[in-house]
Amino acid sequence: MTVLIPALTMAALGLAFGVGLAYALKIFGIEVDPAVALILSKLPGANCGACGKAGCAGFAEALKSHEVMPAACAVCEDETRVAIAEILGIEHKTKVKFIATLLCNGGSRAVDKFAYKGIKTCKAATLQFGGQKACEFGCLGFGDCVMGCPFGAISMGEDLLPIVDPNKCTACGICVDVCPKALFSLLPPDKKYYVKCKSTDIGAIVTKVCRPGCIACRKCEKACPTGAIKVENNLAWIYCAKCENMGKCLEVCPTKVIVRR
């Protein structure tokens, strides 16, 4: 009898709590829109936040209310975007693919101005006089981009520069946001040539702090037959809309800061 009473008491409490929870769910529960649930089932579930929403659930709700378009998800395959567009009853436009591209050619070849002993992150290093590199624009090499990429698309090379795997990169733009030096840019992969530098220092300074940097010699600008390259503010820029991948710029570049993808 002494065992039966506690057992019955616990059973009664369990029943009471169960009924209470069921009632609370009925009164306070939030019904999920079937369309949102269907859209969510199509999304990859990466919850990377690159779309600007609070994970895939937030993105699904934004899609249903037509705040965003399916193309805003960088992780989705094109067929997934088509399926979501059909659910929403809208026309889908194929998204042009981009790849995160590092615009720094320094790394281990760039001169250090002091021995950094602090926390091994680029963000922390930047707080100390802009980082240990003599080039104020250069990559610090601690891999904030590597840690920030949710798809494992970035690794550190032996030259202390990040390497982007084009097969894994979704162009989500997280590396663009986490790099304190703003050294990543999303570029179209069909444009094979780009200037791997962001320094706007004059050539004499660049030569002292980072020999493989852009010295604004204008040889590329003069050699380009389509006028796709302009040197502005001591830095060469390739305008993708005009570039026809001829490679003349790479041939004449004395520091080899223009590279082929």
Positions of predicted regions on the chain:
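Ferredoxin-type iron-sulfur electron-transfer modules and their immediate structural context
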Residues: 1-223, 227-230, 250-252, 256-260
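Glycan-recognition and catalytic cores of secretory/periplasmic carbohydrate-active enzymes
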Residues: 236
